[in-house]
């Protein structure tokens, strides 16, 4: 689950870079929303794994 979260976070960051630099100005709003959604999902995933006491998979 954490792997999926990190993968989508990377995709959102890349989309955000394109949006914030003006390459795809129309997608900037969507990229911002996706970026913050996946930041929240990453934090939730990290907290859930910490509470369960599981070590991250390599």
UniProtKB/Swiss-Prot annotation:
It is a multi-pass membrane protein. It comes from the Bacteria. Belongs to the UPF0391 family. The lineage of its organism: Bacteria, Pseudomonadati, Pseudomonadota, Gammaproteobacteria, Alteromonadales. The keyword Ribosomal protein does not apply. The chain crosses the membrane at residues 6-26, 27-47. It comes from Shewanella frigidimarina (strain NCIMB 400). GO terms for cellular component: plasma membrane. Keywords: Cell membrane, Membrane, Transmembrane, Transmembrane helix. It is found in: Cell membrane. This is UPF0391 membrane protein Sfri_4000. The keyword Manganese does not apply. Its main location: membrane.
